[in-house]
Amino acid sequence: FDLTVPGYFYRQNAGGSYSNASGCGNETASEREMVRHYIIESVKFWAREYHIDGFRFDLMGIHDIETMNHLRSELLEIDPTIFVYGEGWVAADSPLPFEQRAVKENVGQMEGIGVFNDEFRDGLKGSTFDEQEPGYASGNINGHFEPVKYGIVGGTDHPQVDYGGLLYCNAPYAGAPSQMINFVSCHDGYTLVDKLKLSVQGDHAADELIPIDKLV
């Protein structure tokens, strides 16, 4: 991209170096008109020519809300059943103002787009970043009950959820339950059964942990 239009396709810090909200050395500047055009036209091509019926955006928070909403509306014209979702966070800070980022806290401004629910994930199994911390499923009932409830109501406003007891946010952010994707484990971090082995207190045989794994 830089060979095409130097300095245009990637965001820069004040000193001119590449910003790195992706954690991979750079980040595309989706808020710029031709970067936005490239992203949207690429997705439309894949949907039309390859009949792809769902798009997952890694570190979706790098992109701006306007681009994601435009992309969603264009896909609706092709096939209203196409699913759009992503990771509602960034790997590091970005020059893009927080209120413009397509992060989970702003998903209420992105109708028809879903985000992963890391509150429910870590509430149920324990912290992804602390291998020995247990979650609700492994006995940490008091400390992780609210994040589990938050997942049950789909990240929406509900009178039975104490939002002050959440792990990473203090308010509901989904406009509808369909915008919240509950999950427990994925390609990142430990598999669920390995996380249980590390976090469940005491010595437990595999035949004791497997039922917990299946229950979750």
Segments (PLM) and residue ranges:
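Active-site-proximal loop/turn and secondary-structure-junction residues that shape catalytic pockets
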Residues: G61-H63, V90
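Substrate-binding/active-site clefts of carbohydrate-active enzymes
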Residues: F1-Y50, H63, T67-D79, F83
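Conserved alpha/beta catalytic core and glycan-binding cleft of carbohydrate-active enzymes
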Residues: R72-V216
